[in-house]
């Protein structure tokens, strides 16, 4: 049984069609190109996940790539009938993939970044998408990263403010991070991330070295990984105030509560 899981990030692809100045991906591409082998998730793995992820779990179809680049996007989204379906996009392909998006997601988040030279173009694409979509799902959310004027975006939908941090990980935040009252990282308690190759991580933090990997769906079921020894060690360290004993967590400042 999978008990306590609330969110899963599924990386349909790690390919991207935008070069965001504050993205850690740029650093990896330049200094460690061998760590970033671009590609898409095999559709058979998507089919497997549709069967193994429990009902009513929130699925976010993104991680280190642009999900709208996935060739069989509409087919993939349609497989998950009993889960809450969301994704985060830069918006470039919203109009092109609109027939696969409308009524096939619950929410869609458009990331709007500080000092983006393509900002005005992005805004016009979003407006065109929304005019076609009308009142149908998905519900749009605009994730403003850094110092982004919010007025025009607020007219289009919900706003989620986010502060910037170091490109190489969840540290060096521009604002003080928010801690949960229970003092335990909510990501470790309730979250999983699955990359395009089927490697499962304990959270969705930027992790090019794979320090947070706790299982492989090519060898184990999602239930076995969730209840397995590696995740249990992550969880035990956090429950016992030993966050610093876990390699990925010892430099991370994020506690599962977004900072705006």
Outline where the language-model segments fall.
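N-terminal pre-core extensions flanking Radical SAM catalytic domains
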Residues: 1-37, 51, 204, 221-260
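Conserved alpha-helical substructure of the radical SAM core
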Residues: 1-107
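Conserved residues at the C-terminal ends of beta-strands
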Residues: 62, 111, 206
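A conserved catalytic-core signature of glycosyltransferases
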Residues: 63, 187-189, 221
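Conserved AdoMet/S-adenosylmethionine-binding subsite of the radical SAM
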Residues: 70-183, 187
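C-terminal accessory region of radical SAM enzymes
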Residues: 132-176, 205-256
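Short, acidic, Ser/Thr-enriched surface-loop or helix-capping motifs
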Residues: 194-195
